């Protein structure tokens, strides 16, 4: 039997709030999470394939990797689109067939060039068929599943293909799908509204596998909504409580859940006993009318106008740190919404509040409504930090983007005063007394040391005064939460760095746009004083542009390339009209 080589490639993610790149530097990690989709796909290959996985967030793709491969398989989300294009170009140049799957190709496959085979949606049924067709020379360009697969047959992910130490957290998946149908969300379009779950035996085998491979610490259950099927979630939790206890609580768990979790006492208590210490909740906005308009009705209660705030405090009282997702730019948003977001985030004590501008994803109800209303501008980059909107908002765009930057620079201010104030309020709200004893301080010794070293650097920065005050308060009143505060501080450092770059990128693009608009008039005005005056103006402008460009972190420069090229082309055209040459390239 001739062995075939399959190269599984996970393209790069753009640096964002969720990448935690600047926190990972402290931890000695290369990426926050492994590519669970590709690790699961790897288990579907027959034995006559030799596999190699390249996570480009951990190491670069090399020419040797491509020479080794007989088949290249990729999996991407929309935010990885640009990196995927580079991967496909290199693979085709090397003469290798390319397979593309994941949420991005599922929605946008018609826009992706040079890919030989697309596997859309969930591939448990279609991937084995594709491999058989490939072997027989009858492989099709497009494979679309006829129905949602039961995931009770999904095999164990191939964690042995990665170095676990490269990552700050491991991933597992218990369910797919969500019973809700928010207008802006594509989850139900991709995975359906009837959550499908794995068996207890499957899940405990996955926990056991990671345990046997030596993993200890953070483990994220990446379900779209962990409590989408409450009965099955409770069934798993009861088994997981026993497993964690028998293994001395090796994992501290995190997941995503809808806000109505607070209405199910038994579920919350079981999650705490199973070792869940944090939960991500899609809050979106504190405005009930906007929530109803976008079909996020699970966040609204007619008899409680402050239901989201009360829900977050209830979760914290159970021992969960709540991470919140927020959206600006929803229909119905007014200029008052920015202060409402800031006020809510501070009152709710959500240190990690992931604020983003509304993104219209293809295939969502929002997409089709915007299409009917003639408000679509094109495809999204998938990065909710991008201030380039792919739709026409109701609010004036200048007001929206300026308000967005103000929100970010308030909740993640220069000295992180507001951030650390939220951390302190969280410590006051957080009740870990119900958690199993080992989970009351869930960090492990190596993490503690790294976070402590990171703290020393932060204490010497502009964030030092507010951080020092927080440390004094916590040591005095909540010493059991000290290591958790170290972790939050390191994450706050990352969130502030991202905020600085988002602000710098947007300000720089706006500066270039203004300069392009003013170029002709300014050069014409200076022409009255001769070419020497024009050259002085051009020299000063280019020097300023070069300085601002270099001040932007290299991971964010791709956001300004179009604006930079437009400016340089406009400048070159204006100078050429006067028979003057461009200044030295930057």
Can you describe what each PLM-predicted range is?
Residues 41-52, 213-214, 274, 310-322, ...:
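A structural motif corresponding to the C-terminal end of an alpha-helix
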Residues 2-215, 407:
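Acidic, low-complexity intrinsically disordered segments
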Residues 8, 74, 221-223, 281, ...:
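Conserved beta-strand positions
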Residues 140-143, 219, 252, 323, ...:
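Acidic/polar loop patches that form or flank catalytic/metal-binding clefts of enzymes
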Residues 2-8, 50, 65, 386-586:
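Radical SAM enzyme core and accessory elements
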Residues 13-20, 107-110, 230-231, 289-295, ...:
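Flexible glycine/acidic-rich beta-alpha junction loops that bind and position SAM and/or redox cofactors
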Residues 110-129, 270-278, 342-355:
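Structural recognition of alpha->loop->beta junctions
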Residues 155-323, 330, 334-343, 371, ...:
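Radical SAM [4Fe-4S] cluster-binding motif and immediate context
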């Amino acid at each position: 039997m001739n062995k075939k080589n399959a190269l599984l490639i996970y393209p790069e993610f753009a640096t964002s709030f969720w990448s935690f790149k600047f926190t990972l530097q402290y931890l000695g990690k290369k990426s926050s999470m492994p590519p669970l989709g590709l690790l699961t796909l790897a288990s579907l290959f027959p034995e006559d394939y030799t596999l190699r996985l390249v996570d480009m967030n951990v190491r670069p793709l090399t020419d040797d990797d491509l020479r080794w491969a007989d088949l290249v398989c990729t999996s991407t989300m929309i935010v990885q689109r640009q990196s995927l294009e580079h991967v496909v170009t290199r693979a085709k140049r090397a003469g290798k067939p390319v397979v593309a799957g994941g949420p991005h190709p599922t929605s946008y496959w018609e826009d992706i060039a040079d890919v030989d085979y697309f596997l859309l949606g969930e591939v448990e049924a279609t991937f084995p068929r594709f491999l058989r067709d490939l072997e027989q020379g009858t492989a099709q360009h497009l494979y679309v599943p006829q129905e949602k697969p039961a995931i009770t047959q999904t095999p164990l992910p191939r964690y042995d293909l990665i170095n676990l130490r490269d990552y700050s957290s491991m991933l597992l998946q218990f369910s797919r799908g969500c019973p809700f149908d928010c207008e802006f969300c594509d989850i139900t379009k991709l995975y359906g509204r009837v959550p499908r779950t794995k068996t207890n035996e499957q899940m405990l085998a996955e926990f056991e596998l990671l345990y046997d491979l030596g993993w200890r610490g953070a483990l994220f259950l990446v379900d779209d909504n962990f409590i989408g099927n409450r009965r099955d979630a409770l069934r798993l939790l009861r088994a997981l409580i026993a497993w964690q206890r028998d293994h001395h609580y090796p994992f501290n768990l995190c997941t995503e859940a809808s806000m109505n979790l607070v209405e199910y006492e038994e579920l919350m208590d079981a999650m705490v006993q199973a070792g869940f210490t944090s939960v991500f909740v899609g809050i979106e906005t504190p405005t009930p009318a906007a929530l109803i308009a976008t079909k996020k009705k699970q966040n609204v209660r007619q008899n409680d106008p402050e239901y989201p705030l009360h829900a977050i405090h209830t979760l914290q009282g159970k021992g969960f740190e709540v991470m919140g997702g927020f959206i600006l730019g929803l229909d119905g948003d007014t200029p008052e919404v920015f202060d409402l977001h800031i006020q809510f985030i501070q009152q709710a004590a959500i240190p990690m509040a992931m604020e983003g501008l509304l993104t219209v994803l293809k295939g969502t109800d929002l997409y089709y409504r915007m299409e009917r209303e003639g408000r679509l501008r094109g495809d999204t980059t998938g990065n909710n930090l991008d201030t380039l909107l792919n739709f026409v908002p109701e609010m004036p765009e200048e007001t929206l983007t300026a308000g967005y930057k103000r929100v970010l620079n308030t909740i993640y201010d220069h000295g992180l005063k507001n951030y650390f104030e939220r951390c302190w309020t969280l410590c006051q709200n957080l009740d870990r007394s119900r958690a199993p004893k080992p989970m009351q301080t869930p960090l492990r010794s190596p993490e503690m040391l790294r976070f402590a070293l990171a703290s020393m650097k932060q204490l010497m920065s502009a964030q030092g005064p507010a951080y020092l005050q927080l440390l004094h308060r916590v040591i005095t009143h909540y010493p059991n939460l000290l290591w958790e505060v170290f972790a939050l501080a390191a994450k706050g450092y990352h969130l502030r760095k991202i905020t600085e770059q988002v602000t710098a990128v947007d300000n720089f693009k706006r500066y270039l746009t203004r300069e392009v608009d003013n170029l002709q008039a300014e050069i014409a005005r200076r022409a009255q004083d001769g070419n020497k005056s024009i050259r002085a103006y051009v020299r000063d402008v280019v020097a300023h542009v070069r300085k601002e460009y270099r001040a932007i972190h290299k991971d964010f420069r791709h956001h300004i390339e179009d604006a930079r090229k437009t400016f340089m082309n406009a400048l070159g055209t204006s100078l050429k009209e006067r028979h003057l040459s461009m200044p030295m390239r930057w």
